[in-house]
Regions:
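Short coil/linker segments at helix-helix boundaries
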Residues: 73-152, 168-187, 334-364
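Start-of-domain marker
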Residues: 27-93
Length: 408
C-alpha cells in the first residue's frame, strides 16, 4: 500500500515537472504575441486584456515585461484616441480620459516593482525616467478628465481622476518634478476631489484631500460648507459647530452658515447664542429682511414679545411678503394676551388690555393665514381663541368647523 502511494506521488511530481515548462512556454508565447500586437498597433485592447489577465496571477506581479507591455498597449490606445480627436474624428472621450488615468496606475504599479531591491540590494529603474517624462507631459489630462466627469455628474469617476492627479505629488517616480511645491493647480484639484466626495456623500473621500483643498482660497467658503455637512453626516457635533462658526466669522453674508448656526443654537436651546449670531449679522447688514425675521423669531422663542414685535415690523418694512414675520407679530400679541388671561382675578382695565392684544394679533394672524393656508396647525388655534374671546360668532363657527374636520 505504501509503495503504491509513493508511486502515485512520484507520477504526479513527474507530471508537474513536465507540465510546468509547457505553462511557461505558453505564457512566453502570450507575452510575445501581445508585444507584436502593440508593435503593429492592432488589437490593442486584446493585448491589454491579455497582460491584465497574466497580472492577476500573483506569480507574475513582479514581471516587468508584462507591466511594460501593458503600459505600451494602453499608451498606444491613448495616442490613437488623441489623434482621432485632433483630426476631429469620432472617438469615445470618456475612454480617452480613462486611458490617461490607467497609464498612471500602470506606470506606478511597474515603478513599485522596480523599487524592490535585487539580490545585490540595489534597485534597477529601467522605466521610471521614460515613463515619468511621458506622464508629466500628459498629467494635465488627469485634471481635465476630472472636470469633464464633474460636468457629466459622474462623481465617482471624477474623484478617481483628481485623486490620481494629487497622488502624483507624493509618488516616488515623480519626485524630481516637485509637484507639491510647484503645481499651482494642486489645491484646486483637491477642492474638486472634495466636491466629488461630497456629492457622493462619501465622508472618507470628502475629507481625504480637505487639508490641501483649504489652500484653495477661491473656494474656501464652499470648502467649509462641504466639511460642515460631512461632519454632520458623521455626527461630529463639535467639528460641525466649529466649522459653522469659522465660516460665519469669515464671511457672515455667505448664505450657508448663518441659518445653520442659528438653527443649531436654537435646537440646543442656546437662544442667547442664537441671538448673538443674529445681532452680529445685523451689525453688518441692518436692513437685511432675513436677519431681521430671524431675530424676531428668536425673540419670540425667548418670550421677549415686545422686542419681537418691534424687530418683526422692521422686517416687514423692508419686505412685506415675509409670511413668517406676520406670524411672529401676531403670535407675540396673542401670547401676551394669553399670559394676562391666565390670571383669574381680572380688573375691567386688564380685560380691556387683553381684548386689545387679541385685536392687535388678529390682522397679522389673518394675513398669515392668507399667505400660508397650508400651515393650519400654526394659525387655526390662535384665531379660534381670538374669535372666541372677542365674541366673533361667524368667524368662530368657520374656524370651529375647520378644526372639527381635521379631527375626523
Amino acid at each position: 500500500m505504501k509503495i503504491q502511494i509513493f508511486r502515485n506521488l512520484w507520477v504526479l511530481q513527474i507530471a508537474f515537472l513536465l507540465l510546468a515548462p509547457l505553462g511557461l512556454q505558453a505564457q512566453k508565447k502570450e507575452i510575445s504575441a501581445a508585444k507584436d500586437l502593440v508593435k503593429a498597433g492592432k488589437d490593442l485592447a486584446k493585448a491589454e486584456s491579455s497582460m491584465r489577465k497574466l497580472l492577476t496571477d500573483s506569480a507574475n506581479r513582479k514581471n516587468r515585461k508584462i507591466w511594460s507591455i501593458l503600459f505600451d498597449a494602453v499608451k498606444k490606445q491613448y495616442e490613437q484616441g488623441n489623434e482621432k480627436l485632433y483630426l476631429k474624428q469620432a472617438y469615445d472621450t470618456a475612454q480617452l480620459f480613462n486611458s490617461t488615468r490607467q497609464l498612471f496606475v500602470i506606470a506606478q504599479g511597474l515603478d513599485s516593482v522596480e523599487m524592490i531591491p535585487n539580490k545585490k540590494g540595489k534597485c534597477e529603474f529601467d522605466f521610471r525616467k521614460p515613463h515619468s517624462e511621458y506622464l508629466n507631459r500628459i498629467r494635465p489630462n488627469l485634471y481635465n478628465g476630472g472636470t469633464w466627469f464633474i460636468r457629466k455628474q459622474k462623481y465617482k469617476e471624477a474623484y478617481q481622476f483628481f485623486d490620481q492627479y494629487i497622488a502624483c505629488s507624493t509618488a516616488p517616480m515623480f519626485q524630481s518634478y516637485k509637484y507639491a511645491q510647484k503645481d499651482k493647480y494642486l489645491s484646486s484639484a483637491a477642492y474638486w476631489a472634495v466636491y466629488a466626495g461630497y456629492k457622493m456623500q462619501d465622508t472618507k473621500a470628502t475629507l481625504h484631500h480637505s487639508y490641501e483643498a483649504l489652500k484653495d482660497t477661491a473656494h474656501y467658503n464652499y470648502m467649509l460648507q462641504y466639511l460642515a455637512e460631512t461632519y454632520k453626516l458623521e455626527k461630529d457635533t463639535a467639528r460641525y459647530l466649529s466649522t459653522l462658526k469659522e465660516g460665519f466669522e469669515r464671511d457672515p453674508k455667505f448664505p450657508f452658515f448663518f441659518p445653520r448656526l442659528v438653527e443649531f443654537y436654537s435646537q440646543e436651546n442656546q437662544l442667547d447664542s442664537a441671538l448673538a449670531v443674529a445681532d452680529k449679522a445685523l451689525a453688518i447688514a441692518p436692513d437685511n429682511d432675513i436677519y431681521l425675521f430671524t431675530k424676531g423669531t428668536i425673540l419670540l422663542n425667548m418670550g421677549d414679545f415686545k422686542q419681537c414685535i418691534e424687530v418683526s415690523k422692521k422686517a416687514l418694512a423692508v419686505n412685506d411678503s415675509l409670511a413668517g414675520a406676520y406670524y411672529n407679530i401676531g403670535l407675540a400679541y396673542f401670547n401676551q394676551a394669553v399670559e394676562m388671561d391666565k390670571n383669574s382675578q381680572q380688573s375691567r382695565k386688564t380685560h380691556q388690555e387683553i381684548d386689545g392684544l387679541y385685536n392687535s394679533a388678529m390682522p397679522y394672524l389673518q394675513k398669515y393665514r392668507t399667505m400660508a393656508p397650508d400651515m393650519q396647525d400654526q394659525w387655526a388655534l390662535p384665531l379660534y381663541t381670538i374669535y372666541l374671546n372677542l365674541n366673533m360668532g361667524k368667524e368662530f363657527d368657520e374656524i370651529d368647523k375647520l378644526l372639527n374636520q381635521k379631527k375626523k
